Each structure stands twice: as structure tokens, then as C-alpha cells.
Amino acid sequence: IIVMANVIKLRKGLDINLTGRAQEQMLPVKSSTEYALVPDDFPGLTPKVTVREGDHVRAGDPLFVDKGCTEVSFASPVSGTVTAVERGERRKVLRVKIAADVQQEYADFGVKDVAGLSADDVKASLLQAGLFGYINQLPYAIATRPDTEPKAIFVSALRDKPLQGDFEFELNGQEKDFQTGLTALAKIAKVYLGIGAKQSASALTGAKDVEVTVFDGPCPAGNVGVQVNHIDPVNKGEVVWTVDPTAVIFFGRLFNTGKVNLTRRVAIAGSMVKQTGYVDALVGTPLKQILADNIADGCNVRILNGNPLTGVIANEESVLGAHTSEVTLIPEGDDVHEIFGWMLPRFKDFSTSRSYFTWLQGKKAYNLDARLKGGERHMIMSGEYDRVLPMDIYSEYLIKSIISGNIDSQEQLGIYEVSPEDFALAEFVDSSKLPLQKIVREGLDILRKENA
């Protein structure tokens, strides 16, 4: 009998049911000859490229390092020849492109038994293999550094944002690597694993070397920041690490095989996908290979590297992000023209305020497009944010203090325990149409510079 961990019930939040959820079936992927790693996938990173065009790299060899902490490197997903280091304005590194070898060659870091490793051994192994940068931290919601001392490590296996991939489906066949990754992290600090009330995989409910907590409630119960807030909040001067569950699998593969394997199971979802499902693809795979012949016709499409709430706008030339668990396709909406807007009675549109009759239809699935349906306007203090943000903070006052640049007020209002994704739902329901995630990201970046 597995004794279930403590259950935390959340009332605040909002589940947005969209059409096009990924079916639990595997889809074919056309093999790619070119891959790329994007530094912007790792927030807080200032990259310094360590390879040149024409260099040959193995899977696991470093492509770039963090200029502020050069021992943190970032591994190539494939072996091959570096074809380009693409740069943007002010020579910002946009991506490092690699032409893949036909026969893949892996850097060998040696199989290790994590049970006999120390915390320093685990850190050294992740640093050597270029995987340490997949660990994020609070405060600031950035890629962490090895000299930070976390009071705890949080892993959330609950993905509950609209159209997000199901981690239990991704976990099939990866249970051993997942447990090895958890055990390795537990050598560094206490690990809290957050799971959903409907998740039943034994690799989650019976995970060893961690404290399992069940979160029962609507989105954003799966946000790791929400889980931190309810289990062990971050105060000024404290640090917690947060790790994506797929990155835990990456770590486990490293210790079990001695190789860097950045293959992840990604959901292909959204109303503009012909056939929804899952693909196994490497980080850095071009989206045109993942989405080949699977984009529906009929209107302009918005491709998202991620989910509709927190995903990054992409195109077919973009590559699969390092932390991306789904690729989502929704209508752009730029070819839709309506009169009278919200004044018309509507039977297909979603409303959080019950302005339309659709709330009477229960758990109806909606086909929403990417339109804002309104312009940015003055901030309205209406309590909208608090209704969908189950955290013990004054969210509206925090946003106002970030906009005004009042750092003392930000610290008092709890900025150290938030990340941009925590405000994704608030951004969705916001009557003022403010880019809340962007505001929070800029506020955290300014605060980090002030405290440096």
C-alpha cells in the first residue's frame, strides 16, 4: 500500500478547455539534418559561444557557456558540424546551428551509481555534461549557478495549462531515468515532487528520495511557483531550485548511460493541427520537421513553442525549445471581422465573467484564436488577478510597484517568489490587456541587477 502524501486543495484558478488536446498516440517525425540550440531558452543567461563555424562536436559537447559563470556550459543535442552562429542586434547570439552526422557520436561521461555520489559529485557531473543550465531558481526565475545553496528543490509533474502535454504519457518507459534523476537531485537538497490529484503513475505516487505533495485544484496548480508558495515560500536571501520533470529524465539518462540524450516527448496540439498526438524529438529539432504536413488549411495559423498561455510565438523555421513540452497551433484571428463585439449574444465564445451563455454548457471545449479583442488601457483594480492566482501575495499591487519601479515595495509584496508564468492566467483575464508576463520578467531582471 502506498501512503499518499499530504494533499493541498486550491480553489483559485481557471481551467480553459480548448479544442485540439493531444491524443495519446505517437506521430511520425521526419528526420532532420540540421538542429540548433537557442540561448534565449535559458533565462538570465549571457552566452559566450565556445565553437566556431566548421568545428565538429559530439552530442554532449558544449556549444556556449554562461559569460557570468563559465563553468556552466550548454550541451549540443547532436553530433555534427557547426554551420552557423546566428546573431541579432548588438551581436546577440540567437542560435547555434549544427548539421547532424548520419552516424551519431556521443561524448562519454561514464555510467555512475547515484546512490554513492555526493552533492558535489552530482553538480560536477551535470556541469561537465552541459546539463546544469536546465536547473532554474527562485528568486528571479532564471537558470541557476552552482555556487547557489538551495534550501529545497521543486519538481512539478502536473501540467495543467491549456493543451499542455500529459507528463504521465511522456513518463512511459522513462521511469528508471526519472527516479535516478530525482535521487541525484536529492543529494543536493530536499526534493519536493508536486503531482496532480488525477495522476496515478507509480513512478510519481511512489517516487523515492522525495516528498510527494498532491495538488488538487484548477490551473495554475501545476505551476512550480504556486507549489513553492504553498510548501516552502522564498524569503529574501533564500534560494530554491526548480526543475522541469523532463530535465529530471535528462539527468537520469546521463547517470544511467553516461551520455547526453535530449530526446523529449512533445505534444502536438491545437485546433489548427490535422492530427494531434505526441512525437519524440530532440531539443533543437526544427518545427518544420515536427509539423510536416500536419498544419490545417483554412486560415492564418499561430505556431507556439509551448502552450497558449506561456508559449513563445514561433514559425516553421524555429526549433523545439529546451523547456518545451508541447507545440501548439491556434488560429491567428487576423482574418476575422466582427461588428458590435461583445454586445452580440454568443454561443461559441469563452467568458470568465459569464457575459455569454456558453457558461451554461458546462465543460465545453472552445476554439479560441490569438486576438486580444481590445487595446491596452488603464489598469483597473478589480481583484481579477487574485481570483486566478492561488498565491499569498497582493498581485495587483505587486504589478503596480513593478511598473512604477518601487523596489522596496516589490520586495515587501513578494516578488522573490513569483515568475512570469504565475501571471499567465491573470494576463488572460485582464480587462486592461496588460502584458503582465513581460512586466514581471522585466521587473525581475531589474531587481537582479540592483542586487548584483
Language model region names:
Residues 2-50, 65, 215:
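N-terminal, Lys/Arg-enriched amphipathic/low-complexity engagement segments
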Residues 45, 51, 68-71, 275:
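Short, solvent-exposed loop/turn positions at domain surfaces
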Residues 51-65, 84:
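Short, well-structured beta-strand-loop connectors
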Residues 61, 67, 78, 86, ...:
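Glycine-rich, histidine-containing beta strand-loop boundary motifs that form or position
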Residues 71-79:
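Short coil-to-beta-strand transition motifs
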Residues 72, 86-452:
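Buried, small/hydrophobic-residue-enriched core segments of structured protein domains
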